[in-house]
Amino acid sequence: METAVVYTMLAMTLHEAPTPTIELLAATVAAVTGSWSLVGNGDKNAVDGAAVDAMRYSLSASEFGGIVVIGEGEKDEAPMLFNGELLGQGNSIDWDVAVDPIDGTKLAAAGTKGAVSVIAASERGTMLDCHEVYYMKKLVSSNAARGVLDIDASATSNVLALAKALDVPVTDVRVAVINKPINFELIEEIQEAGAQWVRFDEGDIAMAVAAATEGSGIDLLLGIGGAPEGVVTAVAVRVLGGYMQGVLAPQTPDEIERALQAGYALDKKFELEDLVSGDRHIFVLTGVTDGILVDGVREADGELTIQSMVLDSALDGARLVEVKVDA
């Protein structure tokens, strides 16, 4: 389906949304539509490449002006949606943009749950540029955690404090941690404290946003995951009114050296407002396969039904948007 047609459908769905929310939503829908035929084919690079192509094509026709702060890599490594690439047809560069055309490429390639397409934006100069660091230690929860949890505290202390703040038994606290060797000791500590570990193997943006969303079934996200994904998450958490802290966590001597040369303070505890400041924040997450926040694509009668979560500080509350496009 032509981008203009998708854009018109989305405009009808979110007629009250100011620029550039609809354009960003059109971009994730385009990424999902463009890559859907490859989902489940076992080739994660093919799925991701198709999503990148479609998202970039959609954004190139957008009326706003933005710059990619969190993208697919450096210009010589990523020919499209690279860090520093200018987006849209606007006369001025008014927006920082973070893109992840497919978060969970392995999941999409396998056709298993949890793959999404994500884009986020904030006013120019407000989004932390951390592209030189791959990993970040993160703590994400709802507003109930504000003034209660601290990323420097032990997992046991945080789990017990959150149980008290939520007024529930610690055995009811559900903590998401990505299933990687670097987090195995943390996972063991969480379980020994009596909380429930929610396992996931890839795609920490959706799980982190779920942790900041009341009623999602996830109370807290802890552990080391992607640093760029942490900044994307922060945009959503700002809109949701949640709580988040992060510490950059390079894992190899080369990563540490690169981070230091780039001027990052590796001992700095980033509060939510350090990760993304400003007043206007937009976050869009569109389902590829079924996930914790949105359903995956449904194909029937030559049409794709695509579901998205839209968060915009200029709108009231989260919006669940569903559109149909030609398969």
Predicted features by range, described:
Residues 60-61, 86-92, 100, 108-112, ...:
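Solvent-exposed alpha-helices and their adjacent loops that cap or buttress functional pockets
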Residues 68-72, 97-99, 108-110, 129-130, ...:
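General beta-strand structural signal in soluble alpha/beta enzymes
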Residues 118, 123-200, 262, 279, ...:
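Acidic beta-strand-loop-alpha-helix segment within the catalytic core
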Residues 80-82, 110-112, 131-133, 185-191, ...:
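Short acidic, glycine/serine/threonine-rich loops at helix termini
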Residues 180-183, 191-223, 227-231:
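A contiguous, surface-oriented mixed alpha/beta subdomain in the mid-to-C-terminal portion of proteins
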Residues 92-103, 107-128:
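DPxDG-like acidic metal-binding loop motif
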Residues 4-98, 160, 164, 205-206, ...:
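N-terminal subdomain of lithium-sensitive/metallo-dependent phosphomonoesterases centered on the IMPase/IPPase/PAP
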Residues 10-13, 20, 210-228, 232-327:
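Oxyanion/phosphate-interacting regions
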